[in-house]
Amino acid sequence: MIAEFSIENFFSIKSVQKISFEPSADTFMSDEYSYEVKDGARLLKVGIIYGANASGKTNILNAIEFFKMLVLRMPKDRNEKTGVVPFMLDDTSRNEKTKMSMVFYINQSKYILSFELDAKHIYSETLIVYDSIRPTKLYNRSYDAATDSTTIDFGVNLKMTKKSQDVISGNTINNCSVLAAFGKSNVERTKLNDVYDYFAKQVKDVLAPGMLLSGYVKSRLDKDEAGDLKKFILNFLKASDFNIEDVVLHEEEELITPELEQLIQNAPIDKEAKAEMLRKGKITNTELTFKHKAGDKVYDLSEEYESNGTMRFLGMAVILNYLLKTNRFVPIDEVETSIHYELLAYFIKVFLANSNGTSQMLLTTHDINLLNEDFIRRDTIWFTDKDELGETKIVRLSSLGLHKNLSPYNAYKQGKLVKLPFLGSQYINLND
């Protein structure tokens, strides 16, 4: 589970900003909201970020996704850019390094992974583990500008042979993380496997607002041989007042014509998948059919006739099932997209009531109705705000000193928590 993530000099974030899943002293719904990662240490399962348009909410999620990419991606060569973008709205920051750090738990051990980099190089990278109260260095990497080379100091407690250390060092070019180089190296199993696998398998990419999730739903249903997922989806949709009796996945094979082959060749598809398609000489088209009950009869509707909201919420149901059955970290941008507020609240409530593992969600939203709900803990709420210089600042609701009897919703509406968007006159002179 992620305990804390800090960012400095990344897109609209200039000074150090931090998101934390460590709970406050509040005991309200502690069992539902938190999970004990080790004796005496609990972490929150949910974080919710509010903010005006262009205040930097999405940049926080993108920073976590970029952090994951640093851990896993092996550059093509030493000249490939890292992809990092610093704060560009002053002359100093755009020439300074970006810093990122994450505190997370794997199997009751606390890890701290930190990077310092610019567009061309990773200047430092450190991985520390706390198996007890004392920190243990697993490795520390540094860049020497004079020789244009990277040096890695591996910790004794990593218990890795010198030969394996040399293999990883040889694969760690200046724009590549040690963990990414490790992922491409044939070396013995160590704690690096646990860290690499955590990011590869448990930290998911950002779910963007434009994703209707149709393809994701189809792929999950196609693998649902026992029918457990389908049963969960139908129960969830019925409880959410959708008049849907069944969802059926239909498959139809289509021969690849010369015209279709040309489209496949130019499509942004994985090379191996593309080659397999062309080898078979046919492709499989899938479509969802929804069975709606109207009175005493049931009618079939194909997915093209379903609303964006229905398709989005169907996808959210599949994601919810995924979160409850596996241990994952899922960031969702503008979670309320195409979804009625009551459905959003229900989605969060079901997750909290049924989550018994280490799954976490970090959500961004514009829907301030959640601030008026009794079931929302204040330490799960964060606000982003941009100052007059274009810099994003992040603040936690529980740190603002709002009295427990005062409504966060009313305080937000009155501009007492963060600045609200300043709106001019609704009358416009069309002749100007």
Regions found by a protein language model. Give the residues of each.
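C-terminal lobe/lid and adjacent interdomain/linker elements of RecA-like ASCE P-loop ATPase modules
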Residues: 1-4, 326, 346-432
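Pre-Walker A-like glycine/lysine-rich segment at the N-terminus of P-loop NTPase domains
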Residues: 2-66, 432
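Conserved Walker B
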Residues: 10, 334-339, 368
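Conserved P-loop NTP-binding catalytic core
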Residues: 34-48, 52, 61-113, 118-122
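Conserved catalytic network of the ASCE P-loop NTPase/AAA+ motor domain
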Residues: 41-42, 93-95, 105-107, 321-324, ...
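Conserved ABC ATPase signature
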Residues: 46-50, 265-321, 329, 335-339
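Electropositive, glycine-dotted interaction segments
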Residues: 112-258
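Short alpha-helix of the ABC ATPase nucleotide-binding domain corresponding to the H-loop/switch region
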Residues: 340-345
